[in-house]
Structures are given as C-alpha cells and as structure tokens.
Amino acid sequence: MNVGIMCGSSDTASMESRLNNSRAVSEIADMGYTFVMGAGETGSMRDVKEIIRENDNMLITVGNRLELNRTTADVKIEVGSTFERAGHIYENSDVIIFLDGGTGTLSEFCSFLNNKIETDDKNKELVVVNMDGVYNKLIDDLKRKYKEGLASNTLTYFKEVRSPLELKAYLEEVEKKINGSEQERERVR
C-alpha cells in the first residue's frame, strides 16, 4: 500500500509538533508500506524520512530538481511546481496522512479534500492525525460550513485519528479493504 505523508518542513516548528509527527510515523514504519512525500529535507519532513529510511521502507519523493538533488529516495519524481507535487503525491498514494504542518499542509489537505468531493473519489483515503487537537479549528470550521449550508458534509470524506495507535489500526483497515478489492478483481477475471 502506498501511503502519502503531508507534514511541515519548517525547522522552526515546535519540538512538540515534530515529536508528535515522528511518533505517528514510528508506529506505522514497520508495516511494509511504500511512502510518498515531498522532497524537502528540513523540519518534520526530515525527521519522518529518517524514520522511514531506518525501517527500510521504499520512499518515493516528489519535488523540483534542486530538492531532488538534496534527498535520497528509491524513486524521485521531478515536478515544476508545488501544485504538480501535490498532484503526484495524490495520484501515487492509496491513503494520504496529514500530520501537523504549516500553511502548505493545510492547503494540500483542503485541495485533496475538495478533489475527493468533486470527483467522488472513493478509492483515496484521507487521514488527519489530530494529536493534541492541532486540527480542531479546521474541523470545527468544516462543521460550521456544513451547518450553514456552505459545503457538503465534508467530514464524511476523511478520517480523523487522535493517536499513533489509532492511525495504525485505521491503516490496517484500509489495507484489508484494498487487498479485498484486489482479490475480488482477480476472482472476476
């Protein structure tokens, strides 16, 4: 299963944020997934990639030429913009995890959520890792928009988890669902 990870790349992020992101990834790093990420090598992105590499997971990175020259990965995909990067991460992932991050992470979540709604994409799973309530305001705002008729019930298009163990359990569910779908397709052939 390919797991996209979206997280902050700022070296000025709080230690608490970086540790929470690392704890979440440490919990799933031994599950044999292929991870898909931006090519940045700073902040939480660097921390997360170190955990992925230490566990010998396959890593696909997406970024511009300069970023790709500074990173090590099993597969490198060169793109010209952050929009292209996000699109490649979306397309190359079965599930996308949103860890604590900055405006880029929030923007990508909103973009991916909107795409999932607009295309009725039932094959892509979006997961918000809401440890310490870092996404509470965003989720509350989505609830408000639905209540006021400004948006559909967007909460049905992503899963919120609050701990690394809950993340691991949900990814196991998703993997079973994907494997079941693949087995069903093979049976029909």
Predicted regions, residues:
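Short, acidic/small-residue loops that bind anionic groups at enzyme active sites
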Residues: I60-G63, L99, K116-I139, A151-T156
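A charged, well-structured terminal subsegment
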Residues: V95, E148-R189
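Amphipathic helical hotspot of TIR/SEFIR-family domains
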Residues: L106-K116
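Glycine-rich, charge-decorated loop segments at or immediately adjacent to ligand/cofactor-binding or catalytic sites
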Residues: T42-D47, V134-Y146
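Acidic/glycine-enriched connector segments
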Residues: A39-E108
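Short, charged/polar "capping" segments at the starts of alpha-helices
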Residues: A13, E67-R70, V134-L138
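Glycine-rich beta-alpha loop segments
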Residues: M1-L59
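A glycine- and small-aliphatic-rich helix-loop capping segment at beta-alpha/alpha-beta transitions
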Residues: R53-N55, N114-T119
